Amino acid sequence: MAKRPVATSSDDELPFEIEEPVAADERAFFGGQPQKPAAANAKAALPASLAAQEHYHGHRERLRDRFREQGDTALADYEILELLLFRLIPRRDTKPIAKALIERFGSLAGVFGAPAALLTEVKGVGEAVALDLKLISTVAHRTLKSELRSKQVLSSWSSVIQYCHAAMAHETREQFRILFLDKRNVLIADEVQGRGTVDHTPVYPREVVKRALELSATAMILVHNHPSGDPTPSRADIDMTKVIIEAAKALDITVHDHVIIGKDGHVSLKGLKLI
């Protein structure tokens, strides 16, 4: 959510604050060699740890076969995550880990959006696995961003929202992001201008406009997230947006919209006719 100004920048501009071993056979002592177990009983004679490994390796193959033959629609979210964890944790049963991650963070998106420090709090997830999960998340974000670069942003609005949601919806702190556009409304730069706390982040309107001039941008889309999940704008969100619009207008820079991202949706201030 957003708050009124609480601090100053280096230029005295008041900022707006926008608001996871088998025992020996005794028969050997009475002469003769110990009898070998029958082939049919060989599996039962395996140590418990080896039997468990045999079971989950068989499970892995069955899960891979389902994915190969039927695609992702045949698998639950935790099974998709389990398939991935096969590669990251090769010698363990990853099903309990996948289920624990989904339970902790609520969804696949929640898992990949969670900070690495929180991921390592889940039993079975070490620093290396957490880093790999964040790397996969980064690849997904970069893929979505690359799709925006060759398009006119305003005519690809669903792609804009999809990218912003993937990048920001599961952040645990508020961040203020700006999409800078050229005269054809093609993306020039996507920059995080500020990071704050769980319910606010400072925004300096003059710095926003200054950065647009440095990039030779002629338009902007403002975006910030609400970690609470509720994208409803606060009065300070609206007021801050209007200040930026006026400052940008004086330099012939257009602010197309201010979008607020929540876990389950988004709000467009322009769509609500608030700007």
Curated annotation (Swiss-Prot):
InterPro entries: MPN, RadC_JAB, RuvA_2-like, UPF0758, UPF0758_CS, UPF0758_N. Residues 153-275 form the MPN domain. CDD domains: MPN_DUF2466 (cd08071). Keywords: Hydrolase, Metal-binding, Metalloprotease, Protease, Zinc. PROSITE patterns: MPN, UPF0758. The keyword Signal does not apply. This is UPF0758 protein Rleg2_1511. The lineage of its organism: Bacteria, Pseudomonadati, Pseudomonadota, Alphaproteobacteria, Hyphomicrobiales.
